[in-house]
Amino acid sequence: MRQFPRTRAAVAWATVFLATFSAGLTSAPAAQPLYVLGIAADSASNVYLADREMPGVWRMSDGKLSLLFQGSKKFRTPLNAVRCLAIDHQGKLLAGDSATRDIYRFGDDNQPVPLTKGQLGIPMSIAVNKAGDLFVADLEVHRIFKVPSAGGEPALFAQVQAPRALAFDHEDRLWVVSHGKDQLLRAGADDKFEAVVPGRPFEFPSAIVVDEQGTAFVCDTYAKAVWKVSSGKPPEKFASGAPLVSPVGMVRQGADLLVADPRAKGLIRIDAAGKASLSAWTVAE
C-alpha cells in the first residue's frame, strides 16, 4: 500500500507522456508549405506541391494554396516521407513515398491509394509514358521500375546508378538524371541508354523537364541553377542565382518552368527567356 502513491504518479506521468507522444504523431495543419521537394501541374492549371516536413500535399489553384492531403508524423504511414509527384495519363495525381516504400494515386476523394503494396525502396521520381505505364526511379537499389497503370508488381526496367529524376519526351523516350559517371541519359528504341551529356557537368542534378523540341532543362540544386541542354550542344545555364536557393523539383506549365525550392518560401517561375521570379505563398482562407 505504501507504493500506491508512487504507482499512481507513475501511471499519471505515463498517461501524459503517451498523450503528448500521440499528439506529436498527428500533424497540426501548417500555415504554409514547410519544405517543398516535389511539384506537378495538371492540364487544369492546378499545381501540386509535396511537403516533406508537414508532411503532405498542397494544391495551388488561381495562385492560392489549399491543403489537399495531410499525412501523419508516424513513420510508415502514407506520405509520411513524400518526395515526388507526377500526373498520370488520366490527369490523376501520383505521389512517391519512401516511408511506406510505395507510390500512390489520388482518387476523387483526395485520398492516396497505394499501387505496389510497398514493393519499392526510395521512389525519387515518377514519369508516365503515353500508354499510361508508370516509371519509378528507386534511389535505394539503383534501379528504374515499370509499374502497370492500374498498379501491381514493379518490373525491372533498367539498372542506373543513383537515378534521381525521370521524364518522357514527345517521342516517348525516357530521360534519366543520374548521379553516376554520366549524369544525363536517354533510352532509345531498344530501351538501352545513351549518354546525352557525357560525364558530370552538373553539381547536383535533381530534376528534368523536356520540351516539345527535345530540349532538356535540368535542375541543379548545389549550383542554384537550371541548365538548358539543346541537341548537339553542351549544357548552358538557363537561370541561376536568386531567387533560386536550393532548387530540387521542376515541372512545365505552358512555356514556363515552375520550380520547387524548399528554401525559397514561394513558387519560382522561370519564363521562356530564362527570367526567374518568386511568388510568396498565399494560402486560401
Residue ranges and their predicted role:
Residues 11-24:
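Bacterial N-terminal signal peptides
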Residues 29, 66-76, 111-117, 152-158, ...:
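A short beta-strand motif characteristic of beta-propeller blades
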Residues 31-44, 75-90, 118-131, 160-171, ...:
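Beta-rich, blade/repeat-based domains predominating
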Residues 46-48, 92-94, 133-135, 173-176, ...:
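Conserved beta-propeller blade signature
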Residues 52, 98, 139, 179, ...:
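Short loop/turn segments immediately following the C-termini of beta-strands
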Residues 56-59, 102-105, 143-146, 183-185, ...:
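A short loop-to-beta-strand structural motif that recurs across blades of beta-propeller domains
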Residues 60-64, 106-111, 147-152, 187-192, ...:
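Short loop/turn segments that connect beta-strands within beta-propeller blades
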Residues 251, 256-285:
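Blade-level signature of beta-propeller repeat domains, shared across WD40, Kelch, NHL, RCC1
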